[in-house]
Amino acid sequence: MRAFTSLAGHILGSHAAINGYFEMHINYDDASALDKQLAVFHENEALKQNSHYLFDKLLHNDYQLKLERPGFENIKILLALREPEQTINSIVDLFAQKETEELYASPEEATKYYIERLEVLADFCRTLAQDYYYFDAELLQSAPEILLPAMSGWLELDPPLSERYTIFSQTGKARKGDSSNLIHSGTIDKTRIDYSHIRIPKDELRRALSVYRDCRQQMIDHATDSVTL
């Protein structure tokens, strides 16, 4: 969450071989979830002719991917982390804008959420029998010329992924991903958002950074391949 996942989804979903670009909020606990994924996609979009992939992103611990169950043998798994300070700031900023009082508008609660997510992802990687690929999420914005060719190779895409992407029917809509104006640009925006109004307690940030470094290293160590800062 808040790790350029909407940007990643749009870049991937703009390729002729890939369908999907938004978060579908599905638990993949058995192969029947793949039918649900296709049904959710068809609510707003149509499959591209001669395409190979159907994309989804799992951003929260509420949604699981049970790869030990039959039916998931042919999926491709990409995993990414974003460093804690900007991620936590982005979470707080997002929830502070909501009209109702939100738990994650608190830097302390957002930090707790972030740490719990990292720990679940690291555990997932330690126990995963299938191949997966890791990248530092910041590379989508800071060095797409390095990251996108690697992603194209992992997914066996020809032509390779482009820095330009399509604006789709669900782009910017609530519960579909990033709802800011940035996602409507159609290309990678390298503007760094100012979060100077948010204060994360130093002890909390220090703890998040320690967990991030540990979990990130574990995810890199177990990956089939990785691209890092």
PLM features: what roles do these ranges have?
Residues 225-229:
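C-terminal non-catalytic accessory extensions
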Residues 1-52, 164-222:
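PAPS-dependent sulfotransferase catalytic core
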Residues 3-9, 28-30, 63-65, 86-90, ...:
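Short catalytic/ligand-binding loop motif for oxyanion handling, primarily in non-cytosolic enzymes
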Residues 22, 54-57, 134-136:
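Short beta-strand segments
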